[in-house]
UniProtKB/Swiss-Prot annotation:
This is Branched-chain-amino-acid aminotransferase. Its EC number is 2.6.1.42. GO terms for molecular function: L-isoleucine-2-oxoglutarate transaminase activity; L-leucine-2-oxoglutarate transaminase activity; L-valine-2-oxoglutarate transaminase activity. The gene is ilvE. InterPro entries: Aminotrans_IV, Aminotrans_IV_CS, Aminotransferase-like, B_amino_transII, BCAT-like_C, BCAT-like_N, BCAT_family. The modification N6-(pyridoxal phosphate)lysine is found at residue 187. It catalyses: L-leucine + 2-oxoglutarate = 4-methyl-2-oxopentanoate + L-glutamate; L-isoleucine + 2-oxoglutarate = (S)-3-methyl-2-oxopentanoate + L-glutamate; L-valine + 2-oxoglutarate = 3-methyl-2-oxobutanoate + L-glutamate. One of its GO terms (biological process) is L-valine biosynthetic process. Keywords: Amino-acid biosynthesis, Aminotransferase, Branched-chain amino acid biosynthesis, Pyridoxal phosphate, Transferase. It comes from Helicobacter pylori (strain J99 / ATCC 700824). Its cofactor is pyridoxal 5'-phosphate. Pathway: Amino-acid biosynthesis; L-isoleucine biosynthesis; L-isoleucine from 2-oxobutanoate: step 4/4; Amino-acid biosynthesis; L-leucine biosynthesis; L-leucine from 3-methyl-2-oxobutanoate: step 4/4; Amino-acid biosynthesis; L-valine biosynthesis; L-valine from pyruvate: step 4/4.
Length: 340
């Protein structure tokens, strides 16, 4: 396990690294506790906990960056707090208030300040808030007790083919990420467990990950592994898929604003047919972990589509997003939460 002294900040990858403190709050008798920081990273759970048998678990992911002045900056944490609430509602779990969510994130960052990546190192401090159903239980029903936990780890690029490395390669999969009217639009653990096999098959074929198509017709682009998709057309329009089974990415939502307001591009959120790929000169995967990863190739039904990686617009969006996240450029209202 890497320790702070031997971390190579510029080549971290995306893996678990134990840091000093995490925040834990408990839900009992109808309310959340105030929560506290603890140093122990192991949990003791009842063998009957619904999270272990029925997947009653949801989570979030957000990043803190170090600014040039040394401040810790969280990117759009209120959006993550709201999305976690939506996920909790879907699984009949008690919602975590925005206040408790922000408090937990801030305390974890302050307690693990030494793990915050240096300015412009290419790394960041990734926060993983999650809620799980615990306690003695056997039947298929909501838990009576819950844990809300936030831990953190320093991370680098999620995909190997990042913005500086020529882009990533993807292949469509016949597997479905989510069912119609299922849980695709929320961030619950079961969605990701179900994706492991498709990811394994894609990587064994030499690709970075797979692209999921819509579960009804298998003709429309949904998600790119654990990230959202966007494409740049030959006439410079920013297009991203619309579907109730796509997780609403905070990064994608932000890119739509930046593309429209800063780059003055036409922005569309609509269904994208897989056969439309030839209309794009650039394509990318976006999300908290992926940030913006340019796509250089998509394989589908023995046909291959190639894209500029990174293309000019993708690079502009990446630079603009990162400059806001690192405090170099003024951010839209409520996008940046300064800690400490």
């Amino acid at each position: 396990m890497p320790n702070l002294e031997n971390l190579d900040w510029k080549n971290l990858g995306f893996s678990y690294i134990k840091t000093d403190f995490r925040f834990i709050a408990t839900y009992k008798n109808g309310s959340w506790s105030q929560g506290e920081l603890v140093s122990e990273n192991a949990l003791q759970l009842s063998e009957g906990s619904p999270v272990l048998h029925y997947g009653q678990a949801c989570f979030e992911g957000l990043k803190a960056y170090r600014s040039q002045k040394g401040k810790a900056l969280l990117f759009r944490p209120l959006e993550n707090a709201k999305r976690l609430q939506t996920s909790c509602e879907r699984l009949l779990m008690p919602k975590v208030s925005e206040e408790l969510f922000l408090k937990a994130c801030a305390e974890v960052i302050k307690a693990n300040q030494k793990w915050l990546a240096p300015y412009k190192s290419g790394a960041s401090l990734y926060l993983r808030p999650f809620v799980i159903g615990v306690g003695d239980n056997l039947g298929v029903k909501p838990a009576s007790e819950y844990l809300f936990i936030v831990f953190c780890a320093p991370v680098g690029a999620y995909f190997k083919g990042g913005i500086e490395k020529g882009g990533a390669r993807f292949i469509t999969t016949a597997f479905d990420r989510a069912a119609p009217k299922g849980t695709g639009g929320v961030k619950v653990g079961g969605n990701y467990a179900a994706s492991l096999l498709a990811h394994k098959i894609a990587t064994e074929q030499g690709y970075d990950d797979c692209i999921y198509l819509d579960p009804t017709t298998h003709t429309k682009i949904e998600e790119v592994g654990a990230a959202n998709f966007f494409g740049i057309t030959h006439d410079d329009a920013f297009i991203t898929p619309h579907s109730p089974s796509i997780l609403p990415s905070v990064t994608r939502k932000s890119l739509m604003v930046l593309a429209k307001e800063h780059l003055k591009l036409k922005v569309e959120e609509r269904e994208i047919l897989i056969d439309e790929l030839g209309a794009f000169k650039e394509a990318g995967a976006c999300g908290t972990a992926a940030i913006i990863t340019p796509i250089k190739e998509i394989a589908h039904n023995n046909k291959s589509y190639s894209f500029e990686a990174p293309g000019n617009i993708t690079k502009q969006l990446y630079d603009l997003l990162l400059s806001i996240q690192q405090g170099e450029q003024e951010a839209p209202k409520d996008w940046i939460f300064e800690v400490g």
